[in-house]
Amino acid sequence: MAERKATNKYYPPDWDPSKGSINQYRGQHHLRDRARKIDQGILIIRFEMPFSVWCLGCECHIGMGVRFNAEKKTVDKYFTSNIYSFKMKCHQCSNQFEIQNDPKNTDYKLISGLKKRIEQFNPEDSELPSSFIIKYDDNNNNNNNNNNNDNNDTLLKLENKKLDIEKGKKESTQLEKLQEIMTNRTINDYQLSSIMRKSFREKKKEDQIELERQKSKGIMIPLLKENQDDIDTAKDIDFNSNSLKRKLDESNKLKRELIKNESILKSTNNVNNNNNVNNNNNNNNNNKIEAIIRKKSKIDPSLFNNNVNKNKSKVNETFTSNLFK
């Protein structure tokens, strides 16, 4: 932030070009705190560990790629290439360690405070042919022994030649199969492309039709397509079956009770006045029965709208509160 203001935007009123750059005027380095030891030839940089190492102070493992704030300094030269020293501190302890680059071997040297982690590799675990596997003997250091190793390697190649041939045959069959698959795929590439594009067009039309159908029903979210399992599951669902069955049973029970309470002997008067009186009495009795049943029974009241008016009957006695228990 300070560098941006000093170089691009802000110039103090007492500054003029005769006093040099703004950094010279303020007595600052353009790298700010990173150059606090620039008088000693040291620059603070961000150093990334090139390989896995062990810290000799706390025996902590430091993986490849871990970054440190390091002091970079030129200590020597290899021809025209500079040899830099990188000094840094361990994250887990106060141990200081130093690393130098090695231009001659294009590698890094551990000077102090670190030990390189040795990663063992077993070539037999890999799928390389045995002719590519080279075995080294650390105890033989003279030229004669090196020549013997070359001879042994040659004999080893001859011994494992048969295994290499068999493995090559297996790999060649796999390669031939892959080549055949690719050939079959590309032999009619235009026709296959036409079929694929046609299927895409048909699928797009089907999706558009389905989207319009859902919009017509007010469905504004995408739904999955129906399948037979969904249809079978929907058929097995029975909505309010218990309620409908209960209403039917209550209706039948009401009919039976009305029949039981009808008078056995019906009126045989021939006089119209007597008939009118009897009809009025029957209507009054039916209304009383309906009121009593509505009040004291457990039958659904909606059943009276259809059943009681159609099946008029004469009832000589009322129901008790525990009629249908």
Curated annotation (Swiss-Prot):
Task: Give a yes or no for keyword Nucleotide-binding in this entry.
Answer: no
An example of a Pfam family matching this protein is: Saf4_Yju2
Q: Which residues form a coiled coil?
A: 156-262
| Gene Ontology CC annotation, any one | post-mRNA release spliceosomal complex
Record's keyword terms, sorted: Coiled coil
> Mind listing the GO biological process terms from this record?
mRNA splicing, via spliceosome; RNA splicing
- The source's domain of life comes to Eukaryota
Disulphide linkage map: none
State the family it belongs to. Answer: Belongs to the CWC16 family.
Any idea what this protein is called?
Answer: Coiled-coil domain-containing protein 130 homolog
Q: What is the scientific name of the source organism?
A: Dictyostelium discoideum (Social amoeba)
